[in-house]
Amino acid sequence: MFTINAEVRKEQGKGASRRLRAANKFPAIIYGGSEAPIAIELDHDKVMNMQAKAEFYSEVLTLVVDGKEVKVKAQAVQRHAFKPKLTHIDFIRA
């Protein structure tokens, strides 16, 4: 089982996302269920290592957001066109 630490995003938009990526992080979102969507930021290198395993896409993951655990599944993963980088992930609540 994968556990990923995440932070709630304070800024949103193209410029904020570019600043995150320059700081070796990337934006993501958690949605689904009866709760409101949560915009988060993740550490790129840690998630990149985890997503190399096939189980990342099929198992329920645990995101720790501000000390609270959220069970999710990876719904959509966006990658850079030619660099080995993740640019965004959509998580759906499990």
Swiss-Prot record:
Q: Name one GO biological process term.
A: translation
Coiled-coil intervals in this record? none
**Out of the domains of life, which is the source?**
Bacteria
Q: Which InterPro entries has this protein been placed in? A: Rbsml_bL25/Gln-tRNA_synth_N, Ribosomal_bL25/Gln-tRNA_synth, Ribosomal_bL25_short, Ribosomal_L25_dom, Ribosomal_uL5_bac-type
Drop me one GO molecular function for this one.
structural constituent of ribosome
Cellular component terms, GO, for this chain's entry? Answer: cytosolic large ribosomal subunit
Which keywords does this chain's UniProt record carry?
Ribonucleoprotein, Ribosomal protein, RNA-binding, rRNA-binding
Indicate yes or no for the key word Signal.
no
Any Pfam family from its record, for instance, is Ribosomal_L25p
Which proteins does it associate with, and in what oligomeric form?
Part of the 50S ribosomal subunit; part of the 5S rRNA/L5/L18/L25 subcomplex. Contacts the 5S rRNA. Binds to the 5S rRNA independently of L5 and L18.
Family to which the UniProt record says this protein belongs: Belongs to the bacterial ribosomal protein bL25 family.
Q: Name the job this protein performs.
A: This is one of the proteins that binds to the 5S RNA in the ribosome where it forms part of the central protuberance.
Q: Which NCBIfam families match?
A: PRK05943.1
Q: Which PANTHER family match?
A: RIBOSOMAL PROTEIN L25/GLN-TRNA SYNTHETASE, ANTI-CODON-BINDING DOMAIN-CONTAINING PROTEIN, RIBOSOMAL PROTEIN L25_GLN-TRNA SYNTHETASE, ANTI-CODON-BINDING DOMAIN-CONTAINING PROTEIN
Name used for this protein in its record: Large ribosomal subunit protein bL25
